[in-house]
Every structure is written in C-alpha cells, then in structure tokens.
Design a protein with these regions (language model features):
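Acidic phosphotransfer microenvironment of two-component signaling modules
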Residues: 82, 104-105
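Residue-level detector of flexible, active-site-proximal loop/helix-junction positions
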Residues: 12, 20, 104
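Amphipathic alpha-helical interaction surfaces in cytosolic regulatory modules
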Residues: 19-97
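Short, charged, intrinsically disordered terminal tails
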Residues: 106-110
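Short beta-strand/loop segment at the start of cytosolic alpha/beta domains
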Residues: 1-15
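Short acidic-hydrophobic, aromatic-tinged amphipathic segments that line or gate anion-handling sites
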Residues: 98-102
C-alpha cells in the first residue's frame, strides 16, 4: 500500500512510500483530501519512506498547510531525508513547516 494512514487521537499521520508528484500525486491528494474533509486538520506527513517530492507535490503540500491553518490545524513533517530537507531549505519552504526527527516528537508537538 503506497499511502497509509494512522490516527493518534486527534492527530492523523500519513506515510507514503510513493513519490508525492507525477503520476502518483492524484492518488495521494485524493486520500489526503478525504482525510481533511473528515476533520483531519492536525496532520503529520511521515517522510521516512518517501522517495521524493516534485514541484507539483510541494505546491500541494503548501496548499494543504494553508487549509490546515484555516481550520486551526497544521501540517507537520517528520522523518525527512537529507535530500528532502535540502530541497525545502533551497526553496525556503522549510520556513512554512515544522520539522521533527521522529514521529513521537511530531505527535507530541500537537499537545
């Protein structure tokens, strides 16, 4: 299963082992958008298995972050590879997201 969802109380964790972008983006968006519609506004993207993100994928994550913030939530990122962290730093998107080394830290950050 490319994209998995786990609930930790009010926090929803999305883990994917498929690229966020290209041909796989519509399936990922569909799954996450359905979670959001059900009230999942406190989201964590677990990137520990993520092979990559393209520009469309980054744009979607920014849109999702904006939607979460509009509903007094947030999209937080954990387990980002060095390559992903570098991409986010270069594009200055690292300023838009909170990053955590592991899932426990990210879940606890929602209080």
């Amino acid at each position: 299963v490319p994209t998995r969802v786990n609930e930790y109380g009010a926090v929803t964790v999305v883990t994917t082992n498929d690229e966020i972008g290209g041909e796989s983006l519509p399936l990922f968006k569909d799954k996450v958008d359905k979670l959001f519609e059900k009230g999942g506004h406190q989201l964590i993207l677990d990137c520990s298995e993520l092979p990559g993100v393209d520009s469309e994928g980054l744009e979607y994550l920014l849109d999702l972050q904006d939607q979460c913030e509009e509903h007094v939530g947030a999209l937080k990122i954990c387990g980002a590879s060095e390559a992903l962290a570098t991409i986010l730093r270069i594009t200055r998107l690292d300023r838009r997201f909170e990053f955590f080394g592991d899932l426990d830290e990210a879940v606890k950050s929602f209080g």
